[in-house]
Amino acid sequence: MMLKFLVQQVGFNQAQRYVSTLTVLTCALACFIARPNPAHPFRKPETWARVGVWVDTHAFRNRSFAWLCAAISFLFFGFYAVFFNLEEWAAETGIGFKDDPRGGALDNPRLQPDAMRAFWLLSIMNATSTIGRLSSAYLCDHFGAMNVHCVVTLIASLLTLILWTLADTVKAAIAFVVLFGVFSGAVIGLPPASVAHILGPDPAAQAKLGQWTGMMYSCAAVFALTGPVIAGHLITEFKNDFRTVQLWSGACMFVSALCMAMSIYSKHRQMTHEWFSEKRRRLSSVTSANLSKSRSRGGVSQREEV
C-alpha cells in the first residue's frame, strides 16, 4: 500500500528508495531483538565445507518428508498465481478498476456500478492472512501441524475452485479475498512446522530442522518460479479467460492437500511400525530375562538335590 501511493506522489524511483529504507530498518530491528530458542538443539559441524552439512542424503528415505516436499512443490505451483492475477481478474470482470498512470481510472465498459480499486482486493487478502498465520499456531499445538496444514490447504483449494470461479459481484469478490486470505496465511506459514512435526520430538532429529526445511524449499523453488508463468500463459492462450488460472491454482492446491494426506499416512505408519518394534523388543527382553531366571533356579535346584 505504501509503495502504491508513493509511486503516484513521488515517482517510482523515489518510492523504491523509501520502501527499501523502511525494509532495511525493520529487518535490522528483527536481527537485534530476535533470540534463538535455548531449548532447541543446534548442530555444530566440524567444517561447513562438507555437502552433508547442507544436504541430508537420507532425508528422502523418509516417505513422509518426500510426500511433504511434493506437497509444497504443488502448492507453490498454483498458490502464488492467485496473488499475481487477482487485480487483472478484477479489472477484466468489471469488479474492480485499475488506475491510469496518467491519472484517473482506465476505461472499462464492463465496470460494475459499485466497483472498487482492484488494488484493495489484494490488500484485503494480504491483511486477512495475518489471522491465519496467528490462529494456525494455536491450532497446531492442539491438532498437529501436518493435520492443520492439510485441512487449510484443502479448504483454500476449494475456495479457489468454487468461490472464486463463481464470484461475479463485488461482494462475492470481497468474500473470496477475505476467506482465502485467512486460510492462505496458514497455508504459506506452516511448511516449517510440518517439517518439525515429521522429525518428531527427538532432539537429535530436531537438530536437522533447518537443514530439512531448506531442502524442502529448494525442491519447491523451481515450481514457485514457473507456476505463475504457466498461469499467465494459460490466460493469454485462452484469450483472457481467468477460469484457467482459477482452475490451475485450485487443482494444484488440491493435489498438494492430497500429498499432505499421504505424508500424514506415512508418518502414522512409521510411528505404528516403531511402536510395534519397541513392544517386540521389550517383550523379547522380558522373555530373555525370565528364561535366565528359570535356568538359574533350575541350576540351584539341581545343586540342592545333589
Where are these regions (language model features)?
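C-terminal transmembrane helical hairpin of 12-TM major facilitator-type secondary transporters
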Residues: 112, 117-119, 123-135, 140-194, ...
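Helix-loop-helix hairpin linking two adjacent transmembrane segments in secondary transporters
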Residues: 1-38
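Intracellular juxtamembrane helix-capping segments at the cytosolic ends
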Residues: 1, 186-205
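Extracytoplasmic gate region of multi-pass secondary transporters
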Residues: 61-150, 227-231
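Interfacial helix-cap and linker-helix signal at transmembrane-aqueous boundaries
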Residues: 1-11, 90-91, 139-143, 228-240
